A protein has these predicted regions:
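Short pre-catalytic strand/loop immediately N-terminal to key active-site residues, enriched for Gly-Thr
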Residues: 2-6, 176-191
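Conserved phosphate/ATP/ADP-binding segment of small-molecule kinases
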Residues: 109-177, 211
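Conserved N-terminal subdomain of the carbohydrate kinase-like
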Residues: 13-103
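N-terminal phosphate-binding or glycine-rich loops at protein starts, especially the Walker A/P-loop
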Residues: 1-19
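Short beta-strands and strand-loop turn motifs
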Residues: 64-69, 95-102, 126-136, 157, ...
Length: 222
């Protein structure tokens, strides 16, 4: 994921929250961002060679059970990370928490069309799109068909929203559907997506069911 100077989002926020939960984390930065809660000014991508070297440096550490990918500077960067994870940690669950647009409205992957986003989604085990990302990635596909076709579990955040509650729904490749409801807390704030994805990843890494992990993730941002 990206490094944000305010530490309110990105891998700094991820690690801080994961360690509060009791996890041991390693990180591979993908970009250095210039942003705060109100404005995104830009980002500088980490090179392919630097990402590869970071994976090499981590080989002496314990293997992860889950890898969560957040901000990527390009879809090729996502493919590079997935390739390294599959090579070194074949039993690891890969979660992609896509960040296509910042909360301040900046498009992060402006050249990625629906087809290329779908190909990228098919390279991970679990996808965590919010409402905007669902429309950009799924296109005309239903989540049920996409999950089966890509062999990817799709957790659609905020699939239903009332004044009192918000519902998340997971679509599994085998056709199973998992729902999770929580009290509505208003509009998303800067960094809340990081907390949700990190909490979900933590509980899955420790063997929790997807239903439990989704419920815990909702509580983390409530």
């Amino acid at each position: 994921g990206g490094i944000a100077p305010t530490c309110q989002a990105g891998i700094t926020a991820d690690v801080r929250h994961a360690e509060r939960l009791g996890a041991h984390c390693s990180v591979i930065p993908t970009a250095i961002t210039q942003q705060n809660a109100a404005k995104f000014l830009g980002m500088t991508a980490v090179s392919h060679e630097q990402i590869t070297q970071q994976f090499t440096a981590l080989q002496s550490q314990s293997a992860p059970d889950v890898v969560k990918i957040g901000l990527v500077a390009s879809l090729q960067q996502l493919y590079d990370i997935c390739s390294q994870v599959r090579k070194h940690y074949p039993h690891c669950i890969i979660i992609w928490d896509p960040i296509l647009r910042t909360s301040s409205g900046y498009d992060l992957l402006p050249n990625a069309d629906c087809e290329s986003l779908q190909q990228a989604a098919a390279s991970v085990d679990l996808l965590l799109p919010n409402h905007y990302e669902q429309t950009q990635i799924l296109g005309d596909l239903s989540p049920e068909i996409a999950a089966h076709r890509w062999n990817t579990t799709i957790v659609c955040k905020g699939i239903a929203h009332t004044a009192d509650s918000i519902s998340d729904r997971a679509y599994l490749p085998n056709g199973e559907i998992v729902d999770s409801d929580a009290p509505s807390v208003g509009n998303d704030q800067h960094g809340t997506g990081c907390l949700y994805g990190t909490t979900l990843a933590f509980h899955l890494a420790y063997g929790a069911s997807l239903s439990y992990a989704m419920s815990a993730a909702q509580r983390a941002v409530a």
